[in-house]
Amino acid sequence: MTISPPERGSTAKTQVEKVDNPATFELFGKPGHFDRALAKGPKTTTWVWNLHANAHDFDSHTSDLEEVSRKIFSAHFGHLAVIFIWLSGAFFHGARFSNFSGWLADPTHVKPSAQVVWPVFGQEILNGDMGAGFQGIQITSGLFHVWRAWGITNETQLMSLAIGALVMAGLMLNAGVFHYHKAAPKLEWFQNVESMLNHHLAGLLGLGSLSWTGHLLHVSLPTTKLMDAIDAGQPLVLNGKTIASVADIPLPHEFFNQDLLAQLYPGFGAGIGAFFSGNWAAYSDFLTFKGGLNPVTGSMWMSDIAHHHLAIAVLFIVAGHMYRTNWGIGHSIKEILEGQKGDPLLFPATKGHDGLFEFMTTSWHAQLAVNLAMLGSLSIIVAQHMYAMPPYAYMSIDYPTQIGLFTHHMWIGGFLIVGAAAHAAIAMIRDYDPAKHVDNVLDRVLKARDALISHLNWVCIWLGFHSFGLYIHNDTMRALGRPQDMFSDSAIQLKPVFAQWIQGLHAAAAGSTAPNALAGVSEVFNGSVVAVGGKVAAAPIPLGTADFMVHHIHAFTIHVTVLILLKGVLYARNSRLIPDKANLGFRFPCDGPGRGGTCQVSAWDHVFLGLFWMYNSLSIVIFHFSWKMQSDVWGTVNADGSVQHITNGNFANSAITINGWLRDFLWAQAAQVINSYGSNTSAYGLMFLGAHFVWAFSLMFLFSGRGYWQELIESIVWAHNKLKVAPAIQPRALSITQGRAVGVAHYLLGGIATTWAFFHAHILVVG
């Protein structure tokens, strides 16, 4: 930490400007008001596409960084308003159309539902039997499990949340208008990163986690302890009254009574005095370090979760006091960056990170790229933890929800990471000034780009041929009837020794890394089977040859995705083929007429191609997860303790050939969606067909050129002219880039919705 004389800190001054810029619907109601050319109105049908392309591209509206910053800031509030409206809808469905109370009363037999289809002409077939006499559509979002963890015990509370979320949405819309049209922050406020870090770390994350800890301790902990006791058939007694049903549980405000809490957790009786006297051990009954899962609910211990949030709060509150603002103490991000000079032996860089502070505070695309890469990676980490360390009660035995949440968080992560590459490339084109980056780390990476990309390309070729080659070998050997010559657990073994070592390390280290923990961090690492309601909630995940092989397919597809995206960023400004690429912008179809072979070189085209490989990568990841869990983890527990897995452990022997994946996974597990007609999952059958159609529709845009359509349009316009019904707005074919955008959008939408239907129809029936 650097301590400097007080004059180094900036003095407090107003960072908000009062603006007289009234919000008028007259202006908003005019399409294209943000762009001179678009504001003139449509002459051709291209106008509507340009309207969509540029509406949120604030850089194209103005070059004033302060104005762009204010628009982004205001849009954030609009986004938050949409999120609150969406949340309100979820709460409202829970309050009005769900079996939440029925599920709380018997979570191992009742399935969660928050939607009832009204009969028009037979649609009520979609309402399946959810148990306890409720007919509806099964939901797989995990919301019931989350609500139980919050301590919600009835539908009235959900209705209050629904109303509260709408109020919050109104406040957010108001804030968005206020901070753009009435009192708008100055550019220096947006660029004051130390203040932002302090407030976001200490305030948002630190105090946010601390207040959430308070809720967990004073509401969630007592409520869920009483519910767990009811579910275990051993109800607890409060004030001499047996809490035999959810309706008997005191409401949250009643837990303000400390004596009530102390009956459940004696540590609450110690009061606040124990905190200030340093007698923190008094709180050890509700701030625990148990590890493992609660055997009643198959989820992490609520007291562990509360302890975790308290620790996070302390860390972030400390972190939020580290950066230098009005007082001359603390870190300066600019000084930290400019102090980085590389490794003197391996990578000496005298200019190090010089210029990066200015780049990151004047290019919001560069800032966004870093944030998207981090958030996308975090989403993928969340996907892994939701099954390995399930945080919410009974979620681990709700297999449809487990597959749904894994798939959802993987795809969200993939889209965000591709977005990171997109905005990094935009930053390079619109915001990067080569004169300000001479021999710093960014410049050095750009100078080394040929070595980086050619080596990465070699890695992709190596991984692709070797991983796919193992499968081709196995398919061939199996076809020739030579199982002894196959790569498999029973013939030529390819054990994932590094993965097994990491699994063992985590299992063995539980006592040493967390000295007071009573159990390992996760049962998936050489733990034991946790069964809830006769179903497997968690179990060790054995890894073998089949996992080793598909892991290398993952490595291959991820590396190709990175190759495409990284090439797009590193060659965004220029290349040997097109030295003046930066002048052509982020998206362009080709380098003008007369230069053949220069199509699909724009940074936008790399994002376009990267999206296909991202989809490719993650399809294999979610297929691997879905099949592996059904084969080796999930299932029913027999009376003798043995486990009957959903697909009877067929992964190890079937997933080692291409034919096995096609026959024993895709084809076998599509049986439910293909045979869904006439049952309550028939909507997924229709979705499966419809989404295949959307996917096939995308190929029309991807496989045909613009000229074909322009020619067709001109003959159709001729016919309209003959009949004297010619349109005033001239029809035009989509541009090359627009066609590709429509194509990839439908490709992904069709593919994702097909997978959604395939997974749901199957696991809702067998899970």
Curated annotation (Swiss-Prot):
SUPFAM superfamilies: Photosystem I subunits PsaA/PsaB. Chlorophyll a binds at M700, Y708. Signal peptide: none annotated. Gene3D superfamilies: Photosystem I PsaA/PsaB (1.20.1130.10). InterPro entries: PSI_PsaA (IPR006243), PSI_PsaA/B (IPR001280), PSI_PsaA/B_CS (IPR020586), PSI_PsaA/B_sf (IPR036408). Keywords: 4Fe-4S, Chlorophyll, Chromophore, Electron transport, Iron, Iron-sulfur, Magnesium, Membrane, Metal-binding, Oxidoreductase, Photosynthesis, Photosystem I, Thylakoid, Transmembrane, Transmembrane helix, Transport. Pfam families: PsaA_PsaB. Phylloquinone binds at W709. One of its GO terms (cellular component) is photosystem I. The keyword Chaperone does not apply. It is found in: Cellular thylakoid membrane. Its main location: membrane. One of its GO terms (biological process) is photosynthesis. Its EC number is 1.97.1.12. [4Fe-4S] cluster binds at C590, C599. It is an enzyme of class 1 (oxidoreductase). Belongs to the PsaA/PsaB family. PsaA and PsaB bind P700, the primary electron donor of photosystem I (PSI), as well as the electron acceptors A0, A1 and FX. PSI is a plastocyanin/cytochrome c6-ferredoxin oxidoreductase, converting photonic excitation into a charge separation, which transfers an electron from the donor P700 chlorophyll pair to the spectroscopically characterized acceptors A0, A1, FX, FA and FB in turn. Oxidized P700 is reduced on the lumenal side of the thylakoid membrane by plastocyanin or cytochrome c6. NCBIfam families: psaA. PANTHER family: OUTER MEMBRANE PROTEIN, OMPA-RELATED, PHOTOSYSTEM I P700 CHLOROPHYLL A APOPROTEIN A1-RELATED. The PsaA/B heterodimer binds the P700 chlorophyll special pair and subsequent electron acceptors. PSI consists of a core antenna complex that captures photons, and an electron transfer chain that converts photonic excitation into a charge separation. The cyanobacterial PSI reaction center is composed of one copy each of PsaA,B,C,D,E,F,I,J,K,L,M and X, and forms trimeric complexes. This is Photosystem I P700 chlorophyll a apoprotein A1. It comes from Synechococcus sp. (strain WH7803). The lineage of its organism: Bacteria, Bacillati, Cyanobacteriota, Cyanophyceae, Synechococcales.
